[in-house]
Amino acid sequence: MSGPIGLEVQHPETEYRLKKVSEKFIESIHLMVNEPSVGLYRIQEHVRRSLPQLVDKKMELRSCQNQINGVCYDLDYSIKTVQSMQHIPHFTIIQECLRSAIASKKNLDAAKLERRSKKVDEGSGAQSADAVSEVSIETQDVEGFICPNCMQVLTSQDELLEHWQSQHETANDTRQGYNDDANNDQD
């Protein structure tokens, strides 16, 4: 009898044991050679497929984070700006000027309607003195600054601010306190 390598084996049990050992040895070598490489190959394929997607998602996440940080900064800045606007006296003066301008416009409109009704009553003759004065009022230039509360004419904006703070600031604070009390009563 000749063995797998060309050696002659004399005993059948030894041949069986040699065959069994060689099979186990070949199987072990096969597992050592192939199994880790297959596992590493699978891991490598998984990384190759998923890594670009993960990198893209991470870059997208950083971009979103930068946008959110920018929007948060803008929002905080806007909130601080709006809160600081509550303490600017110019807006109070502008509000009073707007109220005064609206009241003046209503008075002018009422006067214009009154003149028209007088014209209709008098007839369609020559222009009356009221119509001429109306034109001169509309085209007259105004120089300086006018306090909307007391209609005092001042020469500069700084004078107007000082006048407003000294004369009308306490009245405005009192009015604000009254409005706050009224709002608290409603709650």
Curated annotation (Swiss-Prot):
<dbReference type="InterPro" id="IPR019320">
    <property type="entry name" value="BORCS8"/>
</dbReference>
<dbReference type="Pfam" id="PF10167">
    <property type="entry name" value="BORCS8"/>
</dbReference>
<protein>
    <recommendedName>
        <fullName>BLOC-1-related complex subunit 8 homolog</fullName>
    </recommendedName>
</protein>
<comment type="similarity">
    <text>Belongs to the BORCS8 family.</text>
</comment>
<dbReference type="InterPro" id="IPR013087">
    <property type="entry name" value="Znf_C2H2_type"/>
</dbReference>
<dbReference type="GO" id="GO:0099078">
    <property type="term" value="C:BORC complex"/>
</dbReference>
<dbReference type="GO" id="GO:0005765">
    <property type="term" value="C:lysosomal membrane"/>
</dbReference>
<comment type="function">
    <text>May participate in the coupling of lysosomes to microtubule plus-end-directed kinesin motor.</text>
</comment>
<keyword id="KW-0458">Lysosome</keyword>
<keyword id="KW-0472">Membrane</keyword>
<feature type="region of interest" description="Disordered">
    <location>
        <begin position="165"/>
        <end position="187"/>
    </location>
</feature>
